[in-house]
Regions:
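N-terminal, membrane-interfacial amphipathic/helix-forming hydrophobic leader that caps
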Residues: 1-73, 79-83, 91, 198-209
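Hydrophobic, aromatic-rich alpha-helical transmembrane segments
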Residues: 3-7, 11, 15, 37, ...
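Membrane interface segments of multi-pass transport proteins and intramembrane proteases
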Residues: 33-34, 97, 105, 138-148
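Non-cytosolic membrane-interface motifs at loop->transmembrane helix junctions
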Residues: 34-41, 100-106, 171-175
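Juxtamembrane helix-loop-helix connectors linking adjacent transmembrane helices
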Residues: 59-124, 142
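Transmembrane helix-loop-helix hairpins at the membrane interface
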Residues: 83, 113-209
Length: 209
């Protein structure tokens, strides 16, 4: 019975941040409607960030503070990673097999550039790194070696995206983000995630110009 209670507590502690984030996104979607999906997602991220950060600080999670040079390096690495993976996905035609991915991409890249940069390159990386690396990865590291925690948190990150194309992309990026979090702390992981999303936005602009 004690082990069951411990397992339930562990699962509750692990999954509630994602459930909380999804509930915020659902509530924002009801408020703003389907025509403003981007506004709902960004509103959810903005509302989730202070809560997730407070929990991350309360748990006194692992991860050292990165310097400015390390943060800039992580951002540049993220941009390169984002561009390479998006080009590989396009070359493999992976997106064509996922209608939900194409629909999501259509919504996101139809936004004005300023909103794409604000939402996809700032708010979403902050919220997602707090959730998937700051909380989920760190909890896994309490009982798993680094490589296992990286793989499991990357699978969790990929699955949360809800379609095959973004799931594979999220898993591969998630592995790199876990390593960045381990080496450079939360700021390094956030910077790499921001760089990856910025690379994707710039690549989209290049091909649609």
């Amino acid at each position: 019975m004690h082990r069951i209670s411990q397992g339930f507590y562990w699962a509750l502690r692990f999954f509630w941040p994602l459930v909380f984030y999804d509930l915020l996104a659902g509530a924002a979607g009801k408020i703003f409607g389907r025509d403003c999906v981007w506004l709902a997602l960004f509103g959810a991220a903005l509302a989730a960030i202070p809560v997730l950060y407070a929990v991350w600080r309360y748990r006194q999670n692992r991860g050292r503070r990165a310097g400015i040079r390390e943060i800039l390096t992580a951002f540049a690495e993220g941009m390169v990673l984002g561009v390479i993976l998006n080009l590989l996905m396009a070359a493999c035609g992976l997106a064509e097999y996922s209608g939900s991915y194409e629909k999501a991409a259509e919504y996101m890249f139809a936004m004005p550039l300023a909103l794409q940069l604000l939402g996809m390159c700032i708010l979403a990386p902050l919220a997602e790194e707090l959730l998937f690396r700051g909380l989920a990865y760190t909890q896994l590291r309490e009982t798993c070696p680094m490589w296992a925690a990286a793989v499991l948190s990357a699978l969790y990150f990929g699955a949360a995206h809800g379609n095959i194309a973004q799931g594979i992309y999220g898993f591969l990026v998630g592995l790199c983000l876990a390593k960045s979090y381990e080496d450079k702390g939360l700021a390094g992981a956030v910077a790499m995630h921001m760089g990856a999303n910025t690379g994707a936005v710039l690549l989209q602009l290049f091909f649609t110009a």
